[in-house]
Protein backbone atom coordinates (compact mmCIF):
# COMPACT_ATOMS: atom_id res chain seq x y z
CA UNK A 1 0.00 0.00 0.00
CA UNK A 2 1.18 3.51 -0.78
CA UNK A 3 0.96 5.15 2.68
CA UNK A 4 2.20 8.48 1.37
CA UNK A 5 -0.62 8.60 -1.17
CA UNK A 6 -3.30 7.39 1.26
CA UNK A 7 -2.30 9.86 3.97
CA UNK A 8 -1.93 12.59 1.37
CA UNK A 9 -5.57 12.10 0.32
CA UNK A 10 -6.63 12.36 3.96
CA UNK A 11 -4.41 15.35 4.79
CA UNK A 12 -4.51 17.32 1.52
CA UNK A 13 -2.34 17.83 -1.56
CA UNK A 14 0.50 19.65 0.22
CA UNK A 15 0.92 16.74 2.60
CA UNK A 16 1.24 14.28 -0.30
CA UNK A 17 4.46 15.87 -1.45
CA UNK A 18 5.90 16.05 2.05
CA UNK A 19 4.92 12.46 2.88
CA UNK A 20 6.45 11.27 -0.39
CA UNK A 21 9.76 12.79 0.68
CA UNK A 22 9.52 11.24 4.13
CA UNK A 23 8.90 7.77 2.66
CA UNK A 24 12.13 8.01 0.64
CA UNK A 25 15.17 8.30 2.94
CA UNK A 26 17.35 9.70 0.16
CA UNK A 27 15.06 12.72 -0.02
CA UNK A 28 15.03 13.50 3.71
CA UNK A 29 17.41 16.50 3.33
CA UNK A 30 14.96 18.03 0.86
CA UNK A 31 12.01 17.30 3.17
CA UNK A 32 13.78 18.91 6.11
CA UNK A 33 14.29 22.08 4.05
CA UNK A 34 10.60 22.13 3.22
CA UNK A 35 9.85 22.17 6.93
CA UNK A 36 11.83 25.39 7.22
CA UNK A 37 9.59 27.31 4.80
CA UNK A 38 7.92 30.35 6.33
CA UNK A 39 4.46 29.75 7.80
CA UNK A 40 2.87 32.05 5.24
CA UNK A 41 4.16 29.96 2.33
CA UNK A 42 3.03 26.75 3.99
CA UNK A 43 -0.42 28.16 4.68
CA UNK A 44 -0.70 29.34 1.06
CA UNK A 45 0.23 25.85 -0.13
CA UNK A 46 -2.45 24.32 2.09
CA UNK A 47 -5.07 26.82 0.96
CA UNK A 48 -5.69 28.32 4.40
CA UNK A 49 -5.12 32.04 5.05
CA UNK A 50 -1.91 33.07 6.84
CA UNK A 51 -2.27 33.87 10.51
CA UNK A 52 -2.02 37.46 11.72
CA UNK A 53 1.29 38.56 13.23
CA UNK A 54 1.44 38.35 16.98
CA UNK A 55 3.87 39.84 19.46
CA UNK A 56 7.18 38.03 19.72
CA UNK A 57 7.35 36.05 22.92
CA UNK A 58 7.72 38.45 25.82
CA UNK A 59 8.89 41.46 23.79
CA UNK A 60 5.52 42.95 22.89
CA UNK A 61 6.85 43.63 19.38
CA UNK A 62 4.60 42.77 16.46
CA UNK A 63 6.80 41.56 13.57
CA UNK A 64 6.62 43.94 10.63
CA UNK A 65 5.28 46.92 12.62
CA UNK A 66 8.59 48.76 12.12
CA UNK A 67 10.09 49.29 8.66
CA UNK A 68 13.47 50.30 7.29
CA UNK A 69 12.92 52.65 4.36
CA UNK A 70 15.63 53.41 1.82
CA UNK A 71 15.96 56.68 -0.08
CA UNK A 72 18.80 57.72 -2.39
CA UNK A 73 19.87 61.37 -2.63
CA UNK A 74 22.22 63.16 -5.04
CA UNK A 75 24.49 64.45 -2.25
CA UNK A 76 25.00 64.68 1.50
CA UNK A 77 23.47 68.16 1.80
CA UNK A 78 20.13 67.03 0.37
CA UNK A 79 20.20 63.80 2.41
CA UNK A 80 20.84 65.70 5.67
CA UNK A 81 18.03 68.16 4.95
CA UNK A 82 15.54 65.38 4.29
CA UNK A 83 16.80 63.33 7.26
CA UNK A 84 16.43 66.23 9.70
CA UNK A 85 12.96 67.04 8.39
CA UNK A 86 11.59 63.48 8.70
CA UNK A 87 12.97 63.16 12.24
CA UNK A 88 11.62 66.61 13.24
CA UNK A 89 8.20 65.70 11.83
CA UNK A 90 8.39 62.37 13.70
CA UNK A 91 7.95 60.45 10.46
CA UNK A 92 11.11 58.60 11.49
CA UNK A 93 12.91 57.78 14.71
CA UNK A 94 16.36 57.60 13.14
CA UNK A 95 18.02 58.11 9.77
CA UNK A 96 21.44 56.74 8.86
CA UNK A 97 23.31 58.36 5.97
CA UNK A 98 25.54 56.04 3.98
CA UNK A 99 27.80 58.17 1.76
CA UNK A 100 29.41 57.41 -1.56
CA UNK A 101 27.30 54.60 -2.93
CA UNK A 102 27.35 54.00 -6.67
CA UNK A 103 24.03 53.53 -8.41
CA UNK A 104 23.78 52.09 -11.91
CA UNK A 105 20.35 52.28 -13.49
CA UNK A 106 18.46 52.86 -16.72
CA UNK A 107 16.88 56.27 -17.13
CA UNK A 108 15.06 57.38 -20.28
CA UNK A 109 16.66 54.66 -22.39
CA UNK A 110 20.22 55.28 -21.24
CA UNK A 111 22.38 53.46 -18.68
CA UNK A 112 23.43 55.93 -15.97
CA UNK A 113 26.01 55.73 -13.18
CA UNK A 114 25.93 58.17 -10.27
CA UNK A 115 27.48 58.65 -6.86
CA UNK A 116 24.70 59.03 -4.29
CA UNK A 117 24.00 59.03 -0.56
CA UNK A 118 21.76 56.27 0.77
CA UNK A 119 19.39 57.08 3.61
CA UNK A 120 18.23 54.22 5.86
CA UNK A 121 15.14 55.44 7.69
CA UNK A 122 13.60 53.59 10.65
CA UNK A 123 9.90 54.22 11.15
CA UNK A 124 6.60 52.56 11.93
CA UNK A 125 5.27 50.62 8.96
CA UNK A 126 2.00 52.53 9.22
CA UNK A 127 3.93 55.77 8.54
CA UNK A 128 5.58 54.62 5.29
CA UNK A 129 2.86 56.19 3.07
CA UNK A 130 3.19 59.58 4.84
CA UNK A 131 6.99 59.31 4.75
CA UNK A 132 6.88 58.54 1.03
CA UNK A 133 4.56 61.47 0.34
CA UNK A 134 6.79 63.87 2.27
CA UNK A 135 10.01 62.66 0.61
CA UNK A 136 8.43 62.98 -2.84
CA UNK A 137 7.38 66.55 -2.04
CA UNK A 138 10.90 67.74 -1.12
CA UNK A 139 13.20 65.44 -3.14
CA UNK A 140 15.04 66.94 -6.14
CA UNK A 141 14.72 63.80 -8.31
CA UNK A 142 11.89 63.52 -10.81
CA UNK A 143 11.29 59.99 -9.48
CA UNK A 144 12.55 59.63 -5.92
CA UNK A 145 13.49 56.16 -4.72
CA UNK A 146 11.53 55.35 -1.58
CA UNK A 147 11.30 51.66 -0.75
CA UNK A 148 10.59 50.04 2.60
CA UNK A 149 11.10 46.61 4.10
CA UNK A 150 9.35 45.36 7.23
CA UNK A 151 11.54 44.54 10.23
CA UNK A 152 10.64 41.05 11.44
CA UNK A 153 13.08 40.87 14.36
CA UNK A 154 15.48 43.07 16.26
CA UNK A 155 16.50 44.42 19.63
CA UNK A 156 13.15 44.81 21.46
CA UNK A 157 14.12 48.02 23.33
CA UNK A 158 15.21 49.64 20.03
CA UNK A 159 12.01 48.62 18.22
CA UNK A 160 9.96 49.93 21.17
CA UNK A 161 11.90 53.23 20.97
CA UNK A 162 11.05 53.58 17.26
CA UNK A 163 7.37 53.24 18.17
CA UNK A 164 7.67 55.73 21.06
CA UNK A 165 9.41 58.41 19.00
CA UNK A 166 6.92 58.21 16.12
CA UNK A 167 3.79 57.52 18.20
CA UNK A 168 2.28 61.02 18.06
CA UNK A 169 2.25 60.89 14.26
CA UNK A 170 0.89 57.36 13.93
CA UNK A 171 -1.85 58.13 16.44
CA UNK A 172 -3.10 61.11 14.43
CA UNK A 173 -2.63 59.49 11.03
CA UNK A 174 -0.74 62.51 9.64
CA UNK A 175 2.60 64.24 9.96
CA UNK A 176 3.11 67.13 12.32
CA UNK A 177 3.39 70.59 10.70
UniProtKB/Swiss-Prot annotation:
It comes from the Eukaryota. It holds the Pfam family CutA1. Residues 1-32 form the signal peptide. GO terms for biological process: protein localization; response to metal ion. GO terms for molecular function: copper ion binding; enzyme binding. Transmembrane segments: none annotated. The keyword Magnesium does not apply. Keywords: Signal. Gene3D superfamilies: 3.30.70.120. GO terms for cellular component: membrane; mitochondrion. Belongs to the CutA family. Homotrimer. May form part of a complex of membrane proteins attached to acetylcholinesterase (AChE). This is Protein CutA. It comes from Rattus norvegicus (Rat).
Amino acid sequence: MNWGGALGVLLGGGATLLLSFLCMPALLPVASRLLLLPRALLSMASGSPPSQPSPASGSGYVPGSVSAAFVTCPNEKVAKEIARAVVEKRLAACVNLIPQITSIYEWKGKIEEDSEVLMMIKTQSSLVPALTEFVRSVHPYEVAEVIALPVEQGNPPYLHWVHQVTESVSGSGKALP
